[in-house]
Amino acid sequence: MISANLTKNVRRAIYKRDGYRCALCDSPKGLQIHHVMPRSEGGSNDPMNLITLCWVCHAIAHGTRMPDCADWMTPVEIHEACIEYVADMYAP
């Protein structure tokens, strides 16, 4: 799931901020940008609403069942972890 509405510069800045790794599982492979609050629910392209996820965590975040990850986080748990990660990143 690629967010075509993000500029290359914004995408690069988020990857850099997150250390070029998935913010949840620490994988450096298959990275994608995820909107913590979906745009369809009023979320924006503000960096505080964006997080780097690997393709597996991103798929799970959007409700795709991954057989090899059955004991991994649920979409709700991923959403909560994303909120916590971004909040910690921007805490004063």
Q: Could you describe each region identified by the protein language model?
A:
Residues I2-A4, S40-T52, A59-P92:
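Polybasic, low-complexity binding patches
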Residues N5-Q32, C54-V56:
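Short cysteine-rich loop/turn motifs with clustered Cys
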Residues G30-S40:
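Short recognition patches in nucleic-acid-associated and regulatory proteins
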